[in-house]
UniProtKB/Swiss-Prot annotation:
Transfers the gamma-phosphate of ATP to the 4'-position of a tetraacyldisaccharide 1-phosphate intermediate (termed DS-1-P) to form tetraacyldisaccharide 1,4'-bis-phosphate (lipid IVA). It comes from Anaeromyxobacter dehalogenans (strain 2CP-1 / ATCC BAA-258). The keyword ATP-binding applies. Pfam families: LpxK. GO terms for cellular component: plasma membrane. ATP binds at A63, V64, G65, G66, A67, G68, K69, T70. Its EC number is 2.7.1.130. This is Tetraacyldisaccharide 4'-kinase. SUPFAM superfamilies: P-loop containing nucleoside triphosphate hydrolases. It catalyses: a lipid A disaccharide + ATP = a lipid IVA + ADP + H(+). GO terms for molecular function: ATP binding; tetraacyldisaccharide 4'-kinase activity. GO terms for biological process: lipid A biosynthetic process; lipopolysaccharide core region biosynthetic process.
Length: 379
């Protein structure tokens, strides 16, 4: 975590932290004004929101990075597919070398590597083989391609809360219950893209990492969610569900990590959560190498971590599935026996019924309305 991010996520920065962040206060004011103006233009219809021709469920958040949107998007897409829907996920494709519109998966299998699609689309395509994944900055264009070319009849807009150019039928906002707003400021003074009052646009709040939140904070967030949306929130925890090797093949039970000395490799917005997951699985983390979010690992970086892990007596270098898809496949396959990958999913603790009801309402709202029968002519 960089020095700036440390300032962002420290909820009580103290005098030194406040002093270090003071110069950014001048930049926060114009960002706040620009965000408010943009929101008002969408609210009043001056800036239009395009209808996709299919129900749209947006998964987003208020802060930058690390809230748990990807597991939530996986869960929502899987639930829609389980209802028989032809689902397509629309993603910005952060970390990709290309910025044009592209199809990462057509629903029959992955078509692009992470270097071209971005790590999150590549992961989503791998985890949801029956779901199409499209990526690019213009999500309305992606939606049109998904509906017209791929036959999608339900769309999941990944990281879409601020992307208001595409109309949606349900806005799901994911908050990290353990630290939802950081220092409370907007960019660049803090991590938030919008103030918490923007939650009034949401249809559902999803509290990730609810198991790590203090009881009094959890109650306050539940009240905030109900006040903003009229619904109780969904609550989840990040649960490790599988252990893979460097080639992303099953590699036995997660119990294999218990008591093992390991090196942790990650390129995440908030790597501390990954370290906590490893410790909860009983692993002894002898060293940790954290790179910036969406970082594409080079051969030299991977070799250095493997070498340092060997020197520290580590059985394996362990990384996340989101990081593993960014590794060069040939490099990862060559080091498959020395790498382990922990798969993490969102395990719902509360609110599964609330989520299902919200999806029901979104699908019903987007359903074509029958035309009234023509009136009989008056004789």
């Amino acid at each position: 975590m960089s020095g700036l991010e440390a300032i962002w996520w420290r909820e009580r920065p103290g005098p030194l932290g406040a002093l270090a962040g003071a110069p950014l206060l001048l930049a926060e004011a114009p960002f706040r004004a620009a965000a408010a103006l943009r929101g008002a233009l969408y609210d009043r219809g001056v800036l239009p929101a395009v209808r996709a021709g299919a129900p749209v469920v947006s998964i987003g958040n208020l802060a930058v990075g690390g809230a748990g949107k990807t597991p939530a998007a996986l869960a929502v897409a899987a639930r829609l597919a389980g209802r028989g829907r032809r689902v397509a996920i629309l993603s910005r494709g952060y970390g990709a070398a290309r910025a044009d519109a592209r199809v990462a998966s057509d629903g029959a299998g992955a078509l692009l590597p992470a270097a071209e699609a971005g790590d999150e689309p590549a992961l989503l395509a791998r985890r949801l083989p029956g779901v199409a994944v499209l990526c690019g900055p213009r999500r309305a264009e992606l939606a049109r391609t998904a509906v017209e070319a791929l036959g999608a009849d339900a769309l999941v807009l990944d990281d879409g809360f601020q992307h208001r150019a595409l109309a949606r039928d349900l806005d799901v906002v994911v908050l990290d219950a353990s630290n939802p707003f950081g220092n409370g400021h907007l960019l660049p003074r803090g991590p938030n893209r919008e103030p918490r009052t923007a939650l009034r646009r949401a249809g559902l709040v999803w509290l990730s990492h609810a198991d790590r939140a203090a009881p009094e904070r959890l109650e306050a967030l539940r009240a905030l969610a109900r006040d903003a949306t009229g619904r109780a929130p969904v609550e989840s925890r990040h649960a490790a569900t599988a252990l893979l090797d460097g080639a992303l093949r099953e590699a036995g039970s997660l119990e294999a990590l218990r008591g093992r000395r390991v090196a942790a490799l990650s390129g995440l917005a908030r790597p501390a959560g990954f370290l906590r997951t490893l410790e909860a699985l009983g692993a002894e983390v002898a060293l940790a190498r954290a790179f910036p979010d969406h970082h594409r690992f080079t051969a030299g970086e991977l070799e250095a971590v493997l070498r340092d892990g060997d020197a520290a007596g580590c059985a394996w270098v362990v990384t996340t599935e989101k990081d593993a898809v960014r590794l060069d496949p040939a490099l990862a396959a060559g080091a498959a026996g020395r790498l382990r990958v922990v798969r993490v999913d969102a395990e719902l603790l509360r609110g599964a019924d609330v989520l299902e009801a919200a999806l029901d309402a979104a699908l019903a709202a987007a359903a074509p309305q029958p035309r009234p029968a023509p009136r009989a002519p008056v004789s």
